[in-house]
């Protein structure tokens, strides 16, 4: 769950909460609006370079493989992010990229790996270059 936020709303809320949203279009995001919502787990999914979840459409997460009971649910931020940002990755996977950026979706190897699992607005951009 979460609230649909404009870029301006996301920027204002982000000053207090830090990054806690998922980008769903070029200019819209979904996320919590208060610290209590964020701390309560709203929109809390961690990144992994070997995720078990992908996206269908804008906000529906689906399993990309079988997930065992108790396994953490993760997705690759490359599936949703198109913002100028950087984050050190410590996911521990064999394919860890070490540095995650808001432009990782441009990498051909990730486009191939996650084809059909990107947020629709990113998938549309990728498909237009094929």
Label each residue range with its predicted role.
Residues 1-53:
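Catalytic cores of histone-lysine modification enzymes
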Residues 47-130:
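C-terminal SET catalytic tail plus cysteine-rich post-SET Zn-binding segment of SAM-dependent SET-domain
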């Amino acid at each position: 769950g979460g609230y649909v936020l404009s870029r301006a709303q996301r920027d204002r809320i982000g000053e207090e909460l830090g990054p806690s949203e998922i980008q769903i279009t070029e200019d819209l995001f979904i996320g919590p609006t208060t610290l209590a919502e964020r701390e309560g787990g709203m929109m809390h999914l961690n990144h992994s370079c070997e995720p078990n979840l992908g996206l269908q459409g804008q906000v529906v997460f689906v399993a990309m493989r079988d997930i065992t009971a108790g396994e953490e649910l993760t997705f690759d931020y490359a599936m949703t992010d198109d913002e100028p940002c950087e984050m050190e990755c410590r996911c521990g996977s064999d394919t860890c990229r070490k540095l995650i950026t808001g432009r990782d979706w441009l990498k051909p190897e990730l486009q191939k790996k996650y084809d059909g699992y990107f947020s629709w607005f990113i998938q549309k951009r990728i498909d237009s270059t094929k």
